[in-house]
Regions:
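Acidic/proline-rich low-complexity IDRs
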Residues: 10-12, 59, 86
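Compact, glycine-rich, soluble single-domain proteins
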Residues: 14-63, 72
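C-terminal structural segments of small proteins and small subunits
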Residues: 63-96
């Protein structure tokens, strides 16, 4: 990788918790993104929002079963991807 080149990671995450990406889950998602330096964009159906924006995430209206496309750009892109995958896999800490 060149000195000024930034890593980009793309992934798809399926919302598996019963309440979907509601306010508390969106806050946890945004908080997770804020722990890192990378830029995160989340998209659904052509709508793209910043991963650290609770209001933006809410506009995606992601119900259970929705697949979100995530684009992560930055030196710690892999770490962000792991953290977000873990968060979603853990039902946003809500136990389903």
């Amino acid at each position: 990788m060149r000195k000024n080149e930034r890593k980009t990671r793309n992934l798809k995450l399926k919302v598996i918790n019963a309440r979907g990406l509601h306010a508390r889950a969106s806050a946890k998602f945004a908080s997770t993104v804020d722990r890192f330096r990378s830029t995160v964009e989340v998209s659904r159906g052509g709508l793209v929002v910043p991963g650290n924006s609770i209001m933006g995430l809410l506009t995606l209206a992601a119900e259970m079963g929705t697949v979100l496309s995530i684009k992560i750009t930055g030196d710690d892109a892999n770490e962000v991807g792991v953290a977000l995958t873990d968060l979603v896999s853990d039902f946003f800490g809500e136990g389903q």
